Each structure stands twice: as structure tokens, then as C-alpha cells.
Amino acid sequence: MRIPRVVVSSAGVFHAYHLARGAQSGGYLHRFITSRYRREENGLERSRVVQITLPEYVSLAISAVPGEQARALSYYAGDNMYDWLSRRYVRDADIFHVFNHQGLYSLRLAKREGAITIVERSSAHPTYQHELLTEEYEKFGLRYPSTYRVLHDKHLAEYAESDYIMVASEF
């Protein structure tokens, strides 16, 4: 029996490096896709790391724009660009593990190619988080940026289309 090829994808830091190192130590890591490889994170075979840097720079540039929508727009643009560009690296995965909001398009392709898909969420359920933040914004007389609704909808679409959802928290 062939060893499953695991592809881990994360545009952010989170704990993705630990996940990738764990998969590598078991002989399963086929590829680790990330926005920018952090050199202080050691222990990964460099030949298994794919960097997709442009989305991170686009996101940083947008977040520097003044206004309440900038941060939400930076997530929307950066994560969607990362997701779109990372698709080319998931075709040969047997298991595709991606972090929430960074993988709807790549997840769809991986599934079409026969991979088992896992979406990981590092926070509260998106609907709960959306409701909580909307209430908090209102308490302070602020308007919750409408762009966050689009982000929320993508989170839910990833959940609906993935085979498994992983939450590494009890929150």
C-alpha cells in the first residue's frame, strides 16, 4: 500500500508549521504551501515547501489604506489570491489540509482529483464569531464592515464542501 501524500496549505503562520513537521516526521508530507516561508521555522525539508508570496504583499498594501473596510478587504484579496494560486500545487494530494478561508478553490480541485479534504479553523465557528463581532461593533457605535459577510460566506462554503472540519480549540 502506498503512503498517502499529504499537502498542507496555510497563508498564515498559525500552527501550520507544526502540522507540516508532524506529517513530515511520519513520512506523509508531500508538500507544504505557504505565503512566505519563515526561516526561523526549522525542521521542514525545504524541497517540500512552496512559497506563494504575492498575496501577502497585496494584503499588506491594502491593509495600510485608511478606512474601516481596509482590513476586511485585505483578507478578502490576499486569501482569495493565495487560494487561487495554490491550486496548482494540490493535484497530486491524497489528503489536502487547508486553513479556513484560504482554500475553497484549491479544495474543490483537490476533491475533483480524489483527495480527502480537511478544513481547519483556529477560532470560533464563523457564524458565532460574525454575530459576536457585529454586536461588539454596535456597542461602540461602529458599523461592522460588510466585507466580513463575504468572508463569512466563504468559511461556510469551505465547511460544506470539505470532508472533515478540524478545530484545534475548545472555544
Task: Give the ranges of each region predicted by the language model.
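N-terminal subdomain of nucleotide-sugar transferases
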Residues: 1-52, 87, 91
